[in-house]
Structure formats: structure tokens, C-alpha cells
From Swiss-Prot:
Gene: Aox3
Domain 2Fe-2S ferredoxin-type as annotated: residue spans: 8-95
Species this chain originates from: Rattus norvegicus (Rat)
Major enzyme class: oxidoreductase
Cofactor remark: Binds 2 [2Fe-2S] clusters per subunit.
Identification of the protein by name: Aldehyde oxidase 3
Binding site for [2Fe-2S] cluster 2: 117, 120, 152, 154
Length: 1334
């Protein structure tokens, strides 16, 4: 039969506008097309792998059979444009803008303070928008499932969820208790309200209602196209790949016969990742998305037949419908599948990933295939030779040649049988986090019994995540004929232990944990089946203790809720004075509409080149040769830049721009390729040939560095009292060590820079995503060998920084500047997520050793602490980090005799750098560990020991700085009260007595955080305020808007000082021409010091205006300004703040370093699953001393965001390195920050009743970093839960649990009969897959 006619015309719509592309390139994805071809830059690049949600768009299609339009969210970075024929794409620009009208979703997420840096906001908006197009009144479960595929690094998610919940029918109150009554309605906060405490950050009444009738209509032309669609074969030929999309099954089968090795693609969620990250290319790609037979659903008495082309979301909806109509005993397999479909990947992936693709890919971590395998499912396949049914069994999943599809065969559908009465099916998975994460281990298990007995007639167990393929526990077949009892369970556990074999060096690591999970899942299955058998035949089966059965309940996907309280402004404060009020972020609406411009959103200039770098693949090696000839000959390549092209300084203090002669870490930049597109530059980097010769030593870990005495800088030391003498008088002495892993900044906007040569006098404009524009300017000037006055750095906004954009942008901008100077053309240098994580380094991993002397009542007499941090291969800010860790290590505790020492270890890893908290989260964690250990040794409650050792009266820190701890005690006591600590601790104890396999823990921690830098010049700031003759005001200052709301606060300051409404005032960009010689924006001082500068400039201007105002007191602002101009009075003023007096003398070990302290306390409660290591954050209460907040909405947002980032540091985020120093975790696919389901179910934040802080503007305090350490309250709550489990099992107490407390750490700490079944791995026999670097 002849094939249908070909067409090369691609037709789709974007935001209601028709797009026609002839011979579209199959390798071009929708994200690139939107951003670079049609200049819709609201959709952001965050990771390129569909894991972060930044590029979320809505895709709509019309089904000519059902006559319905479907809307679904998708990750644009994975959607090939060739797959969009007949589709309508809606981006954030298409639903609303400041030029037309903003959509209710955009309005609510902005006014609800759900945006900080704003980079993730368009993706969040589009996820919620798509949900509302399908469900105008969504349920809380739908909201949580929708947002599970979107990441945010700034907000802590609470305000985003709250904005989405405002569309839900039950959004009028917070579900604070089991009665679903609002805490405010019950009068719980009456005392605070009497004291003018406010709990409203915005006015819901101002929100415009959602009107579904006002949405963009689906293009009628596409409906006609779908109805009249000829059976043409769409064929698009690109540079390397041809995309063929047949319209009939016959054409599809013929194409598969002609191109048997061509992959079939519908969702591109697997193939797309291979093409992008593994550089796999396919000459031919076949898309069967138009074949109707692949989307058929048939429901019979035997089971369901599901078309292979159905998306996983469609499969979930179909199964949910069937499960709601049929008895549970008939839908066991369906329920098991649904359990995993709720959390598999993110919503954007489930919406496009096909059932057939998921099955055929046979990924070892597939969540569905083990269930299909045990469920006796069948694959219906077809070829030109006819149809065939293939069992979806362990042979198929293992890739046995005789059991899989032939190259010319196509999977048409999957038959999923109904379960039988005495058949039980269960599914299990454990992932790094609850949503949007591949399973570490998963399983499908099925057992059948002889009717009305517990005698096994069939047993099937399949595991994912155990080997290179799905693994079948075949030996368990020997159990057929046995009774379902404990003896059978013991034998099954031993069989699985023998069958599940993982080598020490198995990819993915966690060998003991994965083996333990396999056995733990079996036990859960045993209990689950026993429970169901008991229900059906109560007399035959033994009673099961409820204490054991609680573990069968998975942690629910619940929507977080909570309260935020702060001091309201004085009733006498003028309405136009917005200081102290919860004002929306200045760019909030622009964030939500996608109109906020980030570095890579700027239009490409004529002749602009794109830069891609070649990085070292060796940790320590000599460069023998570098051959770039093949790269230079590649299409589009203009030049290759190396160290020889640097006209000035190639780096200082060992931090080279380009490696020369030697490389000192994996990820060090060796050379760069400049080409006319990024894709061509990237492809050319793979053609650069470098020959290395390994060098010794190779130092990766802290232990390596100690062995080789490899350090950066001298040892730092502080001491007070007589430590040795105090040890002699102590009742007990405790020694130990604790390890804290590193942390990736994971700012949503990767490192970005554009360098534009101006053509004369060596001048350059640099647009950079940087926290320190002046340092970038200085480094570029030094690199090029020119004065700084030729370089102007521009920073409009930064998509998150957290310290990671302090020093690194200077290096990357210099790399780009050399390329720009050499080629004479503009250069765009935007790091991909993987390169960003590989090159830039993060938070310093730490080893802490301690020796503590204490009395039996818990009073600590002496402590001797040694800290070692992994600094990486160059100094960067590491010496400052270790200094800060030592200075702040004591936290809230008065230890009369204390010695602290610290060293920076020099290793062959990328240099670690500044990160939010700057050493405090590490140092205070070590202290929290040994204080808790003291409590355990004394058999005292941890909170009693913490309270006993806290500062109580005016005193001096270890560096001899005086401070008043009054507000520290207030925070502690208020947090105790707000959290109902003692009553909840009693409830936790009662829960633990009644549950064996699940345990709860509660912990409360105090915090003393010192704000600022150790030198006065670090605190200086400048501002320029200009008043125009129409009365409008332009403010410029030296701070950078990172999402922390500094620009919003500066407008509030100027508004108060000039006594004009905020609407009169505008901030444009920060640049080094307007405000020179700036200091990095960090250390929680940005608003403090720049606010003083803005205040100074405004006061100068008001002083000039005083005579005019006094002459015309009844005039208005515009009249006064016009008169000032007529009188030739300058309406421009530079403000300056010299900085806080600060200095530290390390020889004497003393100094008044910090202008003030921020105090706080946090109480967190968690529940852990002792069998899997999973945990649920139940509730957190935070009390923070913010003094008089300039903007409570911004400050509470900073507290929440920092807390969740800290929660990630201490419990989730894990950087994994090979023994050779290669970073494995190079994106959200492998590295898991907290998602929306990881934050506390109840999340309460209170700002302490204000007290005076004369050091900062308007008596405010900088709160950007302090909340980070409070995340450790979750860690210590987990440790308490683990302690409860170990105590019940009669195990010795673990005095120090290493951080992060991941699922692996938690599970392996809860030792039991199952962990004891697993033999310990011997790392001496072979290298492990990954190693801890602390």
C-alpha cells in the first residue's frame, strides 16, 4: 500500500497568533522558539530537563472525535516544535500584561507576595492558569499536584500556595484544625490583636474575580484543521534530524519497517533528555501522535485496554474513574498504579509523557513497569506483518531479546487485567522527596491465595532502582504453597537479600540502603496483605497490632497553611507613608506577567556571538596539548579563546580565568568557543581535544587534605576562659565529630552575562547577573588591562543569588570580555544548569570535631571545637567563611570556657564560595549537635539543656562584643508559647508509644545571628536621588535587587523622607556609572546601608527645598519642585553612608564586629517512617526579632524562604562526588531542593513585638540570612524521632547524626531486623560510586 502524501508545513498558534513554519528543525524545542525566534521571553530557562517548571506553558488541542478541547501544562524545554502541529500554545504573555490587563492568577501571585526574584513566577502562573482552565474551582489536592512540578528557591512556597488556594471553594479560611475552622475565628490570636498585631499581608477583597468566559478562545482554524485533517505525512528535515509524523496506522507501520531503528516519540520526555544531556542524535524520528488507534480506551469485564499514546495524566484520570465505580478487590492493580501516578515526575511531564514511551523505555527506576509486570499485563503490538500480544513480564522488563518488541513493531495498546477476589497488589516507592523525583527504589508486588485461605498460589515481586533493569525476585516463587505468616516472611527476606545484589560501586550508590528498602517494602506488603486477609476472614488470621499497621499509611500530600503576624503601623502614621506596611514587591506584577527583563531576556544584537566553555575532566593534571582545529572548522564557529588570548591578568590568588599548563579541579575552564549560536558553540566544544597527564596528589575530601596538610591560609582561633582547667572540674566529658554536606545555590537564573564592546576607547557595557557589580567591573578591567572607567556594569535584577553571584560573575564576565575583545563582537555567556553547578561551587562542606565538658545537670563548663571546611581549589571567600563560622559558632549559648579553631582545606574541587548565612549554618549546626548530645548524656530534655546554657543577661560574646540577649529570651519564650511546645511534646510521646514503625519528634532551637561584616568599609553605600521638573523621582543606589525586595524598601524610604506617594518614585537599574565603588549586596545589610544612603540623599534634597516649602506651605509637590527649578536649586543629590564601625583583631581574639544581632527561635515537629526513611514536616513555628520592619511582607518572605532553604540544607540537598572529584548532581534531576510538598504542613511566622535598634534605618533589622539556621529545627526533630525509634528497639543512642538527614540516613539509623539482614559494604575492596567530601 502506498504511503500518504507528504507535507512540510507546520501550523500552530501562539497566544492566538498563527505560526507557519516550513521544514521546521526537529532539534528546536518550544522554549528556544519562544525566546529566540518570536521573542517571547516570559517563559524562562531553568534547567533544560523539565524538572524545574520555569518554562511551563499551556498547550491546547481539539479532539475531533470527542469534540472537546483539552488544556494541559507542559515543559517547553522538552517540547519539539515539530510536535505542535494543530496545537495552540499559551504563554505567560498571552494571559495578561501591564499593557492590557493582568489576569487574576498574575494579580494574586503578585499581591499575595508569591514572588521574590521572580524567575520562577511565569512558570508558577502558567501551572495555576492551566489548572483553572480545567478546574475553575480547584481542590487542594489538585493544586498540590499541579505545583509539584514547579521549583522556587526564594519564597518557601507558602505564599504561592496561598495565592493558588484563593481560587479554591474553601479558601475563605485556613484549615488550622480538624474542625476546618480558622484560628482567627476561634479567637486564638485575640491577645495579639489587642496589641495591634496584624495577620493580614494583603487584602483579598481587592482581587478581581476569575471569569472563565474571558479567556483566550481556541482558534477555530485549528478546529477546522482537526476536523478536515488529511492523512498527510508531516515531514520536517533539519540539519541532523528528520521528523516524520504519519497520519494513519498503516503509514506508521510502513515507516517503522523502512526505518526500524528510528525511535517513536510523543512526549519527548526520555528521548529529549538523551539528545540534550547525552548528545545522542537520531537521523530519523517518527512521531505517532496523530494515530487514533494509539489513543483508544476499551473497558471490558476482563480489564482495561489503554492506548499506548495516552499521556500518563490521561491514564491516571481513566484509572480514577474505573476505581470509583468498581469494588476494591477488582481494582488492586489500578489502585497501585494510581498511587505512583500521583507523584511520578511533575504535572508538566505527566501531561505529555506517553504510556507506551514509559513502558518501552524500560528505565530501571520506572515507577509503573514493576506494577504492570506483576499485574499480568499484555502489550498489543503491530507491524506490517500483523498483530501480536507480548507479556509485559520480567523477561520483557529485563530486555531479554526474545521477549521484547522487534525493531519494526509498534506498541499499540496495553491490556491491564482486573484483579481477582483473592489477589492482592501493592506498589511501593521511596524517592529523595515526595514529588517530582525518580524513585531510589520502587516495587510492584502481587500475591494470590487459594480461596478463603492464606495459602499462596502465586507470588510476583519486581523491583526498580536495584540494577540496570527492573529486577524480579524469582526465588520467591519457592514460597508458593506456603502460608502467609511470619515464617514465610523471614524466608522471603533472606531470599530477597540473596537475590538483590548491588556492588559497592553500583551507580547511584546507597547500596546498603537500597537493599534494605527492598526488604522493608516486602514487610510492608506482608502487613498490608495480612490486614486485608484479616478483614476478609477474621477468624483464620491472627490479630495485628495497630501499633504496626500505622506504617501502611503513606504520608498524605497535604496543602500547607499557617499564619503570619507582625506589628501594625501606628494609627497616626500618614497613609502615604508606606514604611512599615506590607507592600507588594516593586516588580511583582512584572514578574507575574513575564515582563520583568533578566539578562538573557535582552534582545540579541546584530553580530552577537554565543559562548560555550570547555572544562577540565581531570581533578589535577598537566595540560600536555590542546587542539582546537576541528572546533574552529565547525559551522558557525568564529573563534576559540584560551589563556594566551588574555591581554591582562589571567587571574589572581590561583583563580585563573582559563587554565594554563595545569588544571586543579574537574570543571575548571580551559577554553571557550564563540559561535553564531549557542547550539553550534556547544557542539564545537566537544571537538576540542585536550591531552592531560595526571598529577599527584589528588585531594578531594577533608580527610585527604588533613593527610596531606593541604590548607588555605593559617589556622584561625578564638578562646575565652580556661578550657583545660574547666575540663578537670566537669562531671562528664564528651568527644565526637559531625559532618555537614555542601549545598548548591540553585538560584533559578543561572550565571548570565552579556559583554558589548562600544567600539572606541576600549569601552564595554556589561550586563550581568551579579551581587557585586563593582567587583565584576574591577575583574574585567584587570583582565583586559584597562582602567575601570572604561567598563560599565549594569544589573537590572538578579534571578536569585544567595551568595553564589558574588565572586563568580566576575570570573565569568572576564572570560566573556576576553572573547568580546578578541572578536570585536558582543558576547552572550549564559551557563546551562549542569555547567553552572559544575563550575561555580557552593556552600562549604564541614567536618566538626568537639570535646565538651559538662555537669550532670546539663550545664556546659567547657568546649574545645575544631572546624574544617572544604574550600576547594582556590581561596575565593573561604577564609572569611571559616572566620564567620568561628565567630558565630557559640550561637545563643554562653559557654564560659570555649576554644574554637578552624582551617580551610585546599582540595581539587571547584572553589566553594559565599552562601546565605556565610558559615553560621555550619558552625551553629555543630554547636546544636553537641548541645543535644549533652542533653542525651544527662538524660535531660534537649530544650532544658538549651535553655540552661543560653545567654540570660547583658554579656560578651566569644569575640568580646557586648550584647543584650533580652530579645533572644523573648523569642524563645514566645516560640514556646506559640507552638504549645510542652503539650505537643506530650502528644508526640503518646504517639510514639502507640506506633512502632512511625515515630514523631519535636525540637525547638534558639538563634543569635550577628549581622554585617568585620570591616567598616564593607558597610559603606551610596545613592543618587534625582527629582524631575514634573515631580517624579528617580532613585539609584548601590544595592542589587536579588528578590529580597531591596528596591521596594528603597522606594518606601524615599517616600517617607520626601513625604510623597510611592507612585512618584521609580528605580531603574543598578550600574557602576551612576553609583560607583559599590559593595557586594549580602550579609543581610543591603537595605540597612543603602537605605541610609537613600535617606541621606533625600534629606539633602528636602533641606534644599525647605525655604520653598516654608514660603508656600499650602502648595503641592509639583509646585515646589517647579519653583526650585526656577530658582536654580539642584534637584539631584548623592547620598552616602560611611558604614558601621566594625573591626576584628584576630591576634587578640576580640572586636566589635557586628552592628547588631538578630534573634529568633523555631519549633518543628516531624514524623518519620522507620521502614523507608521518609519524613513529613508537620508543623513549624518561627518567632523572629525583626525590630520595626520596613516591609513585613518582604521580611516574612525572607524568613520563610531562608527557613525552607535551610530545611533543604539539613534534610534534603545532597551533593554527590565521585572518588575522582567529579560532581554527579548537576541539575534538579539529581539534586533535590525542597518542593511544595516538603514545607511544613502548618507554617507559622511571627515577628516579635518591636524594640528599638538605633543602628539600622528606622530601627529595622536585616533578616535575609538569619532564618537559614532555623531550618535545623527540622533536623533536630528528625534526630529526636530517630532516638525514639532506637530507644524502643533497645539500641544505643546516636549522639551525632550527619547532615543532611536524608531518607537514607534516617532509615539506616533506625536499625532493625531488616537492616541487620543486609551485609555491610566494604569500601576497601573497591571504590564506592560516591564519597562524602567533608
Amino acid at each position: 500500500m502506498s504511503r500518504s502524501k507528504e507535507s512540510d508545513e507546520l501550523i500552530f498558534f501562539v497566544n492566538g497568533k498563527k505560526v507557519i513554519e516550513r521544514n521546521a528543525d526537529p532539534e528546536v524545542n518550544l522554549l528556544f522558539y519562544l525566546r529566540k525566534i518570536i521573542q517571547l521571553t516570559g517563559t524562562k530557562y531553568g534547567c533544560g530537563g523539565g524538572d524545574c517548571g520555569a518554562c511551563t506553558v499551556m498547550i491546547s488541542r481539539y479532539n475531533p472525535i470527542s469534540k472537546k478541547i483539552s488544556h494541559f501544562s507542559a515543559a517547553a524545554c522538552l517540547v519539539p516544535i515539530c510536535s505542535l502541529h494543530g496545537a495552540a500554545v499559551t504563554t505567560v504573555e498571552g494571559i495578561g500584561s501591564t499593557k492590557t490587563r493582568i489576569h487574576p492568577v498574575q494579580e494574586r501571585i503578585a499581591k499575595g507576595h508569591g514572588t521574590q526574584c521572580g524567575f520562577c513566577t511565569p512558570g508558577m502562573v502558567m501551572s495555576i492558569y492551566t489548572l483553572l482552565r480545567n478546574h475553575p474551582e480547584p481542590s487542594t489536592e489538585q493544586i498540590m499536584e499541579t505545583l509539584g512540578g514547579n521549583l522556587c528557591r526564594c519564597t518557601g512556597y507558602r505564599p504561592i500556595v496561598e495565592s493558588a488556594r484563593s481560587f479554591s471553594p474553601n479558601s475563605a479560611c485556613c484549615p488550622m484544625n480538624e474542625k476546618w475552622k480558622c484560628c482567627l475565628d476561634e479567637g486564638k490570636n485575640e491577645p495579639e490583636r489587642k496589641n495591634s498585631v496584624c495577620t493580614k499581608l494583603y487584602e483579598k477583597e481587592e482581587f478581581q474575580p476569575l471569569d472563565p468566559t474571558q479567556e483566550l478562545i481556541f482558534p477555530p482554524e485549528l478546529m477546522r484543521m482537526a476536523e478536515d485533517s488529511p492523512n498527510t505525512v508531516l515531514t520536517f528535515r533539519g540539519e541532523r534530524t528528520t521528523w516524520i509524523a504519519p497520519g494513519t496506522l498503516n503509514d506508521l507501520l510502513e515507516l517503522k519497517m523502512e526505518y526500524p531503528s528510528a525511535p517513536l516519540v510523543i512526549g519527548n520526555t526520555c528521548l529529549g533528555l538523551d539528545m540534550k544531556f547525552k548528545d545522542v542524535s537520531y537521523p530519523i524520528i517518527i512521531s505517532p501522535a496523530r494515530i487514533l488507534e494509539l489513543f483508544v480506551v476499551t473497558n471490558t469485564n476482563e480489564g482495561l485496554t489503554l492506548g499506548a499514546g495516552l499521556s500518563l495524566t490521561q491514564v491516571k484520570n481513566i484509572l480514577s474513574d474505573v476505581v470509583s465505580r468498581l469494588p476494591k478487590e477488582r481494582t488492586q492493580t489500578y489502585r497501585a498504579l494510581l498511587k505512583h501516578l500521583r507523584t511520578l515526575a511533575g504535572q508538566q511531564i505527566r501531561n505529555v509523557a506517553s504510556l507506551g514511551g514509559h513502558i518501552i523505555s524500560r528505565l530501571p527506576t520506572s515507577d509503573l513497569n514493576p506494577i504492570f509486570g506483576v499485574g499480568n499485563c499484555k502489550l498489543n503490538v503491530a507491524s506490517t506483518e500483523g498483530t501480536q500480544q507480548i507479556p509485559l513480564n520480567d523477561h520483557f522488563l529485563a530486555g531479554v531479546p526474545e521477549a521484547i518488541l522487534k525493531p519494526e513493531q509498534v506498541l499499540i495498546s496495553v491490556f491491564v487485567p482486573l484483579s481477582r477476589k483473592w489477589e492482592f497488589v501493592s506498589a511501593f516507592r521511596q524517592a529523595p522527596r515526595q514529588q517530582n523525583a525518580f524513585a531510589i527504589v520502587n516495587a510492584g508486588m502481587r500475591v494470590a491465595f487459594k480461596e478463603d485461605t492464606n495459602t499462596i498460589t502465586d507470588l510476583s515481586i519486581l523491583y526498580g532502582g536495584i540494577g540496570a533493569t527492573v529486577v524480579s525476585a524469582k526465588s520467591c516463587q519457592q514460597l508458593i504453597g506456603r502460608c502467609w505468616d511470619e515464617e514465610m516472611l523471614d524466608d522471603a527476606g533472606r531470599m530477597i537479600r540473596e537475590e538483590v545484589s548491588l556492588l559497592t560501586a553500583a551507580p547511584g550508590g546507597m547500596v546498603e540502603y537500597r537493599k534494605t528498602l527492598a526488604i522493608s517494602f516486602l514487610f510492608k506488603f506482608y502487613l498490608d496483605v495480612l490486614k486485608q486477609l484479616k478483614r476478609r476472614n477474621p477468624h483464620r488470621c491472627p490479630d495485628i497490632s495497630q501499633k504496626l499497621l500505622q506504617v501502611l499509611e503513606d504520608f498524605p500530600l497535604t496543602m500547607p497553611h499557617g499564619t503570619q503576624s507582625f506589628k501594625d503601623v501606628d494609627s497616626q502614621q500618614p497613609l502615604q507613608d508606606q514604611s512599615g506596611r506590607p507592600i507588594m514587591h516593586q516588580s511583582g506584577i512584572k514578574h507575574a506577567t513575564g515582563e520583568a527583563v533578566f539578562c538573557d531576556d535582552m534582545s540579541v544584537l546584530a553580530g552577537e556571538l554565543f559562548l560555550a566553555v570547555v572544562t577540565s575532566s581531570k581533578p589535577h593534571a598537566r595540560i600536555i596539548s590542546l587542539d582546537a582545529s576541528e572546533a574552529l572548522a565547525s559551522p558557525g564557529v568564529v573563534d576559540v579563546i584560551t589563556a594566551q588570548d588574555v591581554p591582562g591578568d589571567n587571574g589572581r590568588e590561583e583563580e585563573s580565568l582559563y587554565a594554563q599548563d595545569e588544571v586543579i579541579c574537574v570543571g575548571q575552564i580551559v577554553c571557550a568557543v564563540a559561535a553564531d549560536s549557542y547550539a553550534r558553540a556547544k557542539q564545537a566544544t566537544k571537538k576540542v581535544k585536550i591531552v592531560y597527564e595526571d598529577m599527584e596528589p589528588m585531594i578531594v575530601t577533608v580527610q585527604d587534605a588533613l593527610q596531606h596538610e593541604s590548607f588555605i591560609g593559617p589556622e584561625k582561633k578564638l578562646e575565652q576562659g580556661n578550657v583545660q582547667l574547666a575540663f578537670q572540674s566537669a562531671d562528664q566529658i564528651l568527644e565526637g565529630e559531625v559532618h555537614l554536606g555542601g549545598q548548591e545555590h540553585f538560584y533559578m537564573e543561572t550565571q548570565s552575562v552579556r559583554v558589548i564592546p562600544k567600539g572606541e576607547d576600549m569601552e564595554m557595557d556589561i550586563y550581568v547577573s551579579s551581587q557585586d557589580a563593582a567587583f565584576t567591573q574591577e575583574m574585567v578591567a584587570r583582565t583586559l588591562g584597562i582602567p575601570k572607567n572604561r567598563i560599565t556594569c549594569h544589573v537590572k535584577r538578579v534571578g536569585g543569588g544567595f551568595g553564589g553571584k558574588t565572586s563568580k560573575p566576575g570570573l565569568l564576565a572576564s572570560v566573556a570580555a576576553v572573547a568580546a575583545q578578541k572578536t570585536g563582537r558582543p558576547i552572550r555567556f549564559i551557563l546551562e544548569r549542569g555547567d553552572d553547578m559544575l563550575i561555580t561551587g557552593g556552600r562549604h562542606p564541614l567536618l566538626g570535631k568537639y570535646r565538651v565538658g559538662f555537669m550532670n545537670n546539663g550545664k556546659i563548663k567547657a568546649a574545645d571545637i575544631q572546624l574544617y571546611i572544604n574550600g576547594g581549589c582556590t581561596p575565593d571567600d573561604s577564609e572569611l567563611v571559616i572566620e564567620y563560622a568561628l565567630l558565630k559558632l557559640e550561637n545563643a549559648y554562653k559557654i564560659p570556657n570555649l576554644r574554637v579553631r578552624g582551617r580551610v582545606c585546599k582540595t581539587n574541587l571547584p572553589s566553594n564560595t559565599a552562601f546565605r548565612g556565610f558559615g553560621f549554618p555550619q558552625g551553629a549546626f555543630v554547636t546544636g549537635t553537641w548541645v543535644s548530645a549533652v542533653a542525651a548524656k544527662c538524660h535531660l530534655p534537649p530544650e532544658k539543656v538549651r535553655e540552661l546554657n543560653m545567654y540570660k543577661t547583658i554579656d560578651r560574646t566569644i569575640h568580646k562584643q557586648e550584647f543584650d540577649p533580652t530579645n533572644l529570651i523573648k523569642c524563645w519564650e514566645t516560640c514556646m508559647e506559640n507552638s504549645s511546645y510542652y503539650s505537643r511534646k506530650k502528644a508526640v510521646d503518646e504517639f510514639n508509644q502507640q506506633s512502632f514503625w512511625k515515630k514523631r519528634g519535636i525540637a525547638i532551637i534558639p538563634m543569635k545571628f550577628s549581622v554585617g561584616f568585620p570591616k567598616t568599609f564593607y558597610h559603606q553605600a551610596a545613592a543618587l536621588v534625582q527629582i524631575y521638573t514634573d515631580g517624579s523621582v528617580l532613585v539609584a543606589h548601590g544595592g542589587v535587587e536579588l528578590g529580597q525586595g531591596i528596591n521596594t524598601k528603597m522606594i518606601q524610604v524615599a517616600s517617607r523622607e520626601l513625604k510623597i506617594p510611592m507612585s512618584y518614585i521609580h528605580l531603574d537599574e543598578m550600574n557602576t556609572m551612576t553609583v560607583p565603588n559599590t559593595i557586594t549586596t549580602g550579609g543581610s545589610t543591603g537595605a540597612d546601608v543603602n537605605g541610609r544612603a537613600v535617606q541621606n540623599a533625600c534629606q539633602i534634597l528636602m533641606k534644599r527645598l525647605e525655604p520653598i516649602i516654608s514660603q508656600n506651605p499650602n502648595g503641592d509637590w509639583e509646585e515646589w519642585i517647579n519653583e526650585a527649578f526656577i530658582q536654580s536649586i539642584s534637584l539631584s543629590a548623592t547620598g552616602y553612608f560611611r558604614g558601621y564601625q566594625a573591626d576584628m583583631d584576630w591576634e587578640k581574639g576580640e572586636g566589635d564586629i557586628y552592628p547588631y544581632f538578630v534573634f529568633g527561635a523555631a519549633c518543628s515537629e516531624v514524623e518519620i517512617d522507620c521502614l523507608t526513611g521518609a519524613h513529613k514536616n508537620i508543623r513549624t513555628d518561627i518567632v523572629m526579632d525583626g525590630s520595626f520592619s520596613i516591609n513585613p511582607a518582604v521580611d516574612i518572605g525572607q524568613i520563610e524562604g531562608a527557613f525552607v532553604q535551610g530545611l533543604g540544607l539539613y534534610t534534603l540537598e545532597e551533593l554527590k562526588y565521585s572518588p575522582e572529584g567529579v560532581l554527579y548532581t548537576r541539575g534538579p534531576h539529581q539534586y533535590k531542593i525542597a518542593s511544595v510538598s516538603d514545607i511544613p504542613e502548618e507554617f507559622h511566622v511571627s515577628l516579635l513585638t518591636p524594640t528599638q535598634n538605633p543602628k539600622a534605618i528606622y530601627s529595622s533589622k536585616g533578616l535575609g540570612e538569619a532564618g537559614m539556621f532555623l531550618g535545623s529545627s527540622v533536623f533536630f526533630a528528625i534526630a529526636a524521632a530517630v532516638a525514639a525509634a532506637r530507644k524502643e528497639r533497645g539500641l544505643p543512642l546516636i549522639l551525632a547524626i550527619n547532615s543532611p538527614a536524608t531518607a537514607e540516613v534516617i532509615r539506616m539509623a533506625c536499625e532493625d531486623q531488616f537492616t541487620n539482614l543486609v551485609p555491610k559494604t566494604d569500601s576497601k575492596c573497591c571504590k564506592p560510586w560516591s564519597i562524602p567530601v567533608a
